[in-house]
Curated annotation (Swiss-Prot):
This is Y+L amino acid transporter 1. The chain crosses the membrane at residues 38-58, 70-90, 108-128, 134-154, 161-181, 187-207, 223-243, 260-280, 305-325, 384-404, 417-437, 442-462. Keywords: Amino-acid transport, Cell membrane, Disulfide bond, Glycoprotein, Membrane, Phosphoprotein, Transmembrane, Transmembrane helix, Transport. GO terms for molecular function: basic amino acid transmembrane transporter activity; L-arginine transmembrane transporter activity. The gene is Slc7a7. Disruption phenotype: A mouse model for human lysinuric protein intolerance (LPI), where homozygous knockout mice for Slc7a7 gene are born at a frequency lower than the expected Mendelian ratio. Only two homozygous mice survived, whereas 16 of them died within 24 hours of birth. Growth retardation is an ongoing feature of the two surviving mice kept on a low-protein diet with citrulline supplementation. It comes from the Eukaryota. Strongly expressed in kidney and intestine. Weaker expression observed in epididymis, testis, ovary, thyroid pancreas, sub-gland and liver. One of its GO terms (biological process) is L-leucine transport. Pfam families: AA_permease_2.
Length: 510
């Protein structure tokens, strides 16, 4: 693992331990680091592209199922958007104050130290990132393959192979050049937004033609039971997840003090308005029974409205998944990169290609994890395990924001919010942590167990000083690192001291 001089290539290991990063390190390698190639437009597309996934096309019925009326469901969609704006604004302050990539991992590390940060990283490594990427890839594959089998279900193997090819292709694109990855993100974000605009325009035309029956007495039959409202809001917030995407790549943003909060400020209203108007469009054509009975609401909508052009929506869903998967790969690879740099993962993962300046090892590691999870037949079941963990660590990040306000009040903060925003958000995340514990207790407890399974690794590996680890183990790790350097043409990266902050102490000591 990385020691206290982890940002200097030649000092990571002693040569007599068989290190791959010993005396032979080139002086030039010390200058290799991730470049600032993400513009304001790229940032907006990353956030919008990750937030707008397949959910708004396929299953927006979760909110309607629990709210039981069109009127209340639209209110809950709006509340979910406002809540997400609060969270995104808090992350904008954190991202401009702690200018490290890694999002909540970096913020928890700064506020509370290495232990909680490692558990956050462990949960992402084991469940959150590979599971979500595998599910997105499978959804993409299903929408691409199913039209070839109109009268029966698509073969299982065909879907999984196409999903694997999708993960491999996007991993290669992001390994090649950062610009290629951002270009893919921009193009597919435009495509999915245009598809939703087409749905919205069709809905507006229908309303203009007098199709307003579903909006008369729109609150009739509403379920105001706290349990139902809680589950409806939870469904809406799941669709809004992804607003923290840009915080995973803070160190690669041009002028982050300006572009990070501005990207968030532009993206959040766009997504909220699109979600609201898309649901209005659905409600103008489909009644409650049709929506709840549909496996893919947008496809059912297109069958009734677009006629021979109804193929547009399945293609749009596939495009949406492709763009969302690309954003997820970018974010997850940076999380692994930062985790390695902070000493919580093997050194090899925080290396950067010497010519292309891309984090090739972390991208490959992330890709391999996702491919492994594709082999899990009931992969969708794994999603149920991480709802509790996800919101717990998001809330803990905002608690860290409040703690740093108290602990370090004089710290430079380019963006400083009123305490109203983080306090309200913290109170709401308590609710979001409690909901799955109440409604899905078994799966939530399994998720907690998965997070706690990282304890032995932390106390028996991470916290053990490197010189006390078995020599054979150090040599094995050094050999793997050496071969990865050769294979990936990569060297350990320096942190950008101009925009980042060196750890004041080793996270392993906390």
């Amino acid at each position: 693992m990385v020691n206290s001089t982890k940002y200097e290539v030649a000092a990571q290991h002693e040569a007599d331990d068989g290190s791959a990063l010993g005396d032979g390190a080139s002086p030039v390698a010390e200058q290799v680091k991730l470049k600032k190639e993400i513009s304001l437009l790229n940032g907006v597309c990353l956030i919008v592209g990750n937030m707008i996934g397949s959910g708004i096309f396929v299953s927006p019925k979760g909110v309607l199922m629990y709210s039981a009326s069109f009127g209340l469901s639209l209110v809950i969609w709006a509340v979910g958007g406002i809540f997400s704006v609060f969270g995104a604004l808090c992350y904008a302050e954190l991202g401009t104050t702690i200018k490290k990539s890694g999002a909540s991992y970096a913020y928890i590390l700064e506020a509370f130290g290495g232990f909680l940060a490692f558990i956050r990283l462990w949960t992402s490594l084991l469940i959150i990132e590979p599971t979500s990427q595998a599910v997105i890839a499978i959804t993409f594959a299903n929408y691409m393959v199913q039209p070839l089998f109109p009268s029966c279900g698509a073969p299982y193997a065909a879907g999984r192979l196409l999903a694997a090819a999708c993960i491999c292709l996007l991993t290669f694109i992001n390994c090649a050049y950062v610009k290629w990855g951002t270009l893919v993100q921009d193009i597919f974000t435009y495509a999915k937004v245009l598809a939703l605009i087409a749905v919205i325009i069709a809905g507006i035309v229908r309303l203009g033609q007098g199709a307003t029956a579903n909006f008369e007495n729109s609150f009739e039959g509403s379920s105001f039971a706290m349990g139902d409202i809680a589950l409806a809001l939870y469904s809406a917030l799941f669709s809004y997840s992804g607003w923290d995407t840009l915080n995973y790549v803070t160190e690669e943003i041009r002028n982050p003090e300006r572009n990070l909060p501005l990207s968030i400020g532009i993206s959040m209203p766009i997504v909220t308005i699109i979600y609201l108007l898309t649901n209005v469009a659905y409600y103008s054509v489909l009644d409650i029974k049709e929506i709840l009975a549909s496996d893919a609401v947008a496809v059912t909508f297109a069958d009734q409205i677009f006629g021979v052009f109804n193929w547009i929506i399945p293609v749009a869903v596939a495009f949406s998944c492709f763009g969302g998967l690309n954003a997820s790969i970018v974010a997850a690879s940076r999380l692994l990169f930062v985790g390695s740099r902070e000493g919580h993962l093997p050194d090899a993962i925080c290396m950067v290609h010497v010519e292309r300046f891309t984090p090739v090892p972390s991208l490959l590691f992330n890709g391999v994890l996702s491919l492994v999870y594709l082999c899990v037949e009931d992969i969708f079941q794994l999603i149920n395990y991480y709802s509790f963990s996800y919101w717990f660590f998001v809330g803990l990040s905002i608690v860290g924001q409040l703690y740093l306000r108290w602990k370090d009040p004089d710290r430079p903060r380019p963006l400083k919010l009123s305490l109203f925003f983080p306090i309200i958000f913290c109170l709401c995340t308590i609710f979001l942590v409690a909901v799955p514990l109440y409604s899905d207790t078994i799966n939530s407890l399994i998720g907690i167990g998965i997070a706690l399974s990282g304890l032995p690794f932390y106390f028996f590996i991470i916290r053990v000083p490197e010189h006390k680890r078995p020599l054979f183990l150090r040599r094995i790790v050094a050999s793997i690192t050496r071969y990865l350097q050769i294979l990936c043409m990569s060297v350990a990266a320096e942190m950008d001291l101009e925009d980042g902050e060196l750890s004041k102490q080793d996270p392993k000591s906390k």
